[in-house]
Amino acid sequence: MLDFNNLQNYRENNRIEAKNALGGLPESIWETYSAFANSQGGIILLGVEELEDKSLHALDLPDPQWLIEDLWAGLEDPKVVSQNILTPDDIEIRIIDGKQIVTVIVPPAAWDQRPIYIGADPIRGTYRRSGEGDYRCTPEVVRAMMRESGKCEC
């Protein structure tokens, strides 16, 4: 787990993603959710920016509860994401240096839940995490996930 009192010591990597979120829930959160779920899991930090030196810095979310409600709405909407694998314990408002952020801990999806994808098309909406980025999976990788999960005989 991260030491939130020393957030500036962390960098984005294959398990940490910072998102500004001052203008609302970023659309790119779904790619990161899919990528973390289909990889080793990770933590999304809403209300955190990555500075030029790559260090992380807490912003101050004006209404973090609204962001959480928006996130839950998307997680429960099959038009947004194929499956919700989060529990209420995975999402939390934290205060860092007097600033409110939201942490979203995304566990790795169980093999029989994979792939976790955006929208209705697993071939176009499945992502994996590599380094600091979320990358769309190739159709071959998606079909392999589906075979492993028992979702198709492709």
What are these regions (language model features)?
Residues 1-154:
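Conserved N-terminal catalytic/coupling substructures associated with nucleotide/phosphate chemistry
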